[in-house]
Amino acid sequence: MVEFRTTDQLQAGLAEVERSPIDDGTLELIVQRPATDEREVLDEAALSATEGLVGDSWNQRGSSRTDDGGPHPDMQLNIINSRFLALIAGDPERMALAGDQLVVDLSLGSADLPPWSLLRIGDSVIEVTDQPHTGCAKFTKRFGLDAFHFL
C-alpha cells in the first residue's frame, strides 16, 4: 500500500524543490499518455505545434475550459518540476503517474517562467500559456489530498 506524504513531510522537502535551477534546467522524464490511465516512459519524443507530444492522447481529452468541451489548445503539454514530483511520489517508479508529459529540473514558478515565456527543450521551443495546471481527482487518488493542496 502506498503511503502518501503528509503536509509536514511536504513542507520539510520544500527547500530542495526551491533549489531548482532558474535557467539551464534538465529534462528528467518524458511520459506519453497513449490512452486514459496508460503511461509510457520514453527516452526521446517529438513535439508538434498541432499534436503536442506526438502519440499522446491530450487531443482526445475534453476540457471544461473550452466552449465546446473539447481539448484545450493551450494545454497540449503539462510540465512538472522533478524535485516536487520526487517529493510527492516517494518511489521513482510512481513519477509517471502524475500525468505530466515532461518532468524537468527547473523552477516553474510564475516569477521565473511567466505566461508567454519561451522554453527550449531539445530542438523544440514551447510557449508557456496562462492555463494553470492544477491537480485533479486522479492526482489526489495517486498522491494524496495533502499533495493536491500543496500544489
Segments predicted by a language model, with ranges:
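Metal-cofactor-dependent catalytic cores
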Residues: M1-L151
